Amino acid sequence: MKRINKDYLYKLTNNYIKNIDISIKDHYINEYNNKGTKLQRINKINSWDNQLYKFNKKNVINTWILDRLVSKLLIKIFKVRVNIINNNIINNGQIKDIYINKPKFKHTINKVYINFNYILSSNNITINDIDNNMNKYYTSIINDINNILGISNNNNNNIINKDNISNYLSKLYNKKVIIESNRLIYHYNDNTILNKMIINNMEKHKGGLSGKYSKILRTNIPVNNSILIRNKYISSIINNNYIKLNHIINLTSYNNLNILNIYNTLNLNKISKDLLINKYIIGLNVLYKGKNLNTAGISRSIKDRLLLGSLSNKLYGKYSNFLSSSLINNNNNNLKLGSSNINTNLNINKSYKLNYIPNHHNIITNNKVNKVKTGTFGITTKLNTI
């Protein structure tokens, strides 16, 4: 790590800065002159990633070039790949990534502040899987990063490594450089880091781009992980049942267990809210699954997607009469979803006796799909969300 540090610091020597090709500076000057001669065009004070103001246009260009060089340096340093050898956590050779967003610069009269976010990421473990050994490993990496960058400890302003990047950059800027790093826990706390993570992991999943994108989001964003929400809800039920049974066995511990309040944490409405809080309901999925009783082992299933809103397909094809406000006048038999009324007088929870399921099956007729023969036919529904 120390060798890598010296290699990057070598590129930032005063000799390197002074010997930058003049044509590069002219390129930037011409680029901004083409946009106008106003100094505000090159003044980065209104930019989200740089606050800089100098009265000399040449000094502005030179400082801005130096900022871009330092930004690339920090991004390169955080591309270090670390092999984890602990077989109890991850197999040998597994790579851990360190993602960083674009650093932000703030120039004052006598100081330069450099602020950025970063996250330690692993492909095979999650936050909940981190044990004490992994915490020690993370702490070791964070300490190494702080020593390389010259970030002082919260409890001690003394930096162990005096030959750090902060001190070296201070010589280049001719003013004190303070590097402020913010370690993130979740990728979605920073959109740049989230985009880098998605791009880096896109090829690690099978299927199309939309499927890969959905899998990555479900894994890294807890509010979109329906499996995590379901398991959490089931764990709450198991835990409450355990408390209840334990109370029945030990009746003397009534006051300590507070048995009357153990189900306050369970809310049937809350789990549906958690599952749909970041999703848009766009319609229904209706699954028809049947089997011919006379022919063992043969079954068929068909899925119909009934879409509403801007993606509505109710005006086309076989769904043209399924969603209609004129089918049933009784409001008790209508389910309002968006601006349309869905005919719920179809007894979709009933098992229908059918001989077969046609390839283009339609449920819009008033006879409630009653083609009675010798088979059984079940219908299930599910919300369509994006």
Curated annotation (Swiss-Prot):
It comes from the Eukaryota. Its main location: mitochondrion. It is found in: Mitochondrion. Keywords: Mitochondrion, Ribonucleoprotein, Ribosomal protein. GO terms for cellular component: mitochondrion; ribonucleoprotein complex; ribosome. Essential for mitochondrial protein synthesis and required for the maturation of small ribosomal subunits. Belongs to the universal ribosomal protein uS3 family. This is Small ribosomal subunit protein uS3m. The gene is VAR1.
